[in-house]
Every structure is written in structure tokens, then in C-alpha cells.
Swiss-Prot record:
PROSITE patterns: HEXAPEP_TRANSFERASES (PS00101). It comes from the Eukaryota. One of its GO terms (cellular component) is cytoplasm. This is Mannose-1-phosphate guanyltransferase.
Amino acid sequence: MKGLILVGGYGTRLRPLTLTVPKPLVEFCNRPMILHQIEALAAAGVTDIVLAVNYRPEVMVETLKKYEKQYGVSITFSVETEPLGTAGPLKLAEKVLKKDNSPFFVLNSDVICEYPFKELAAFHRAHGGKGTIVATKVDEPSKYGVIVHDIATPNLIDRFVEKPVEFVGNRINAGLYILNPEVIDLIELRPTSIEKETFPILVEQKSLYSFDLEGYWMDVGQPKDFLAGTVLYLNSLSKRHPEQLAKGDNIVGNVIIDPSAKISGSAKLGPDVVIGPNVTIGEGVRITRSVVLSDSTINDHSLVKSTIVGWHSTVGKWCRLEGCSVLGDDVEVKDEVYVNGGKVLPHKSISANVPKEAIIM
């Protein structure tokens, strides 16, 4: 089987992290975001994976060659000379996707969930339609495009309603699909949207179904959602693989700690914390609902909550970081500094407080 991952552009929503590392390689729970997807596709029997990108593939090539060997898959880049939206990339990769005339998966690279690829493929074959969308239930459907089903046929999609004012349903498109190769014939090689241009044709043909996703789902393409997705992932891990979570007197709730990290016995971590490789955590440090990426240091008695600390960064003593702050690569926060919602660009040193949301350049 084959899969296409829509990687797209510059990952601007996840800046300042993506100023240094392409978004698919930013670590989510200590593994590159895209690796979660490659592993799930490989486990479902996918042998050919296409990454649809429109910048910096050369940075990713080396890392992904390693995964090819590890997971026994072939990974190719489909490079767009202009952004082609969410449907154009399928046309561009037509050769690979039509290779053996079997259905193929399409997924948005920002989506984190318990990927149900095997079950999705079986469901798709059983209903005989041309496409299946994975649907997830949400609490506030009025913020999304909602899937409305055909009354007579289970799971057959009747229409989509964009940001409904009245309740029509609570299932939304989760950004994962399986499609038959003939769907590519409906797409032109130009910037085009699968949601707005391709799916309505399949709905008209009564050939588009939805598959309900069990468990958590999150689009982690921006810092707030990256942290929320981390909470969901850790919660899921506590049920599926509790042995992967850290244990100890100074651990509260769900925490992942890389074995190479050095953590003071008087520091307290959790709930919902990820500590990357070669991180150093000083005495009396308190970290909650945060991610500390590799090679960073949090010095004594600092408080870090709802924050992403980028690679090679240093947080001084008695600092307080909160409010969805993000430190880019190689940032230094001097002693006793307060940062609330600051986005600090790479290679900056800050010695003044950042009391409200701001970009520090």
C-alpha cells in the first residue's frame, strides 16, 4: 500500500521552532512529528510513502533515509514549485499513488492520534465507495466544517456544513483519508483543495464515507495545540504503554524523560511534561505541562509551565516561564526573568521581563 503525507510549507504557525528545524522533524514527545506517522503507516503494511513538500526537502533527506531502512519503506519527496493546496499534491504524485491500482492513504502532517490505518483500510474495502474520511467528534462543532450523513445509508456522507450556526452534527474531518486511485482523475495539477473541490464531487457521486476515530485527536501545528496534544498523547500512553512513562518521587502524573537527561532529585516534574535528550534540570525546579527539547538547561528554582523550551536553550535561576511561551533554538533567559506568552527567536538572550504576549526578535 501507499501513503501521502501533506507536509506543505514553512510551518509558520509553529515558529520560532520551525525557523531552525523543518516542522516534520520537530520532536513531538521526543520523536520527530513525522516519525509517529511513518511508523503507523509502516505497521499497517504501507511500503511507499510520499512526502508532499514545498520547501527544504534537503534538510529532511538524511533523517528520512535512516527511517527507510528502519521501517522497510520507500520514502520519496514530491516537491511543489508552487504551493498546490491539499489536492494538487495528489496529482503531482500520481505516478507513485497509481502504481498498483490499490487505495492509498492521505494524511495531514500536523495530526496526532491513534492512527487507525488497518481498520480504515478494511472499512473502506467493505463499503465499496471511492473515498473514506476519518471523522473525529468535537465539543464545539460551530468552529469547524461538519460532516452530515445520509439518513438511509450508514456512514455515507450527504454534505459538509461549514461552521454551522445550528447543530447539524459533531463530527469533523480529522485530516486522514483513504482514496481509490481514480479519485486522482478528478484533480487538476494546480493549487486546489481536496476538502472544497474534490470531496464535494465524491459526495455528489454518493461515494464518500466517514470512519469514526476512537480516542484522542489533535492538530498540533501551533504551540497551544502542540502542548494540548502532548497532554492527550501522554494520557493515551499511560493506558497503552505505561512502562514508557517516568516513575519517581519527584514525578507527578504523566511524564516522559529521555534516559540521557540529568535531573536534580529536588526538582519536581509533571503532570504532562516531556524532557528531551541531554537536558539538565537544576535544584528546586518545577515544570508542568511543558516540553523541554534536547540539550537545554533549566537552572535552579525556576518555574516552567505551559511552555516549549527549544533546543540548546538555557533558562537562568529563579525564572518563571508560562502562558504558552516558546523559546527558539539557542535562547538564553537570564536569572530572575519572567516570561508570559513570549515567543523568543533563535540565538536571543533576554534579561528583561516579558509580561505579556510578544515576539522577541
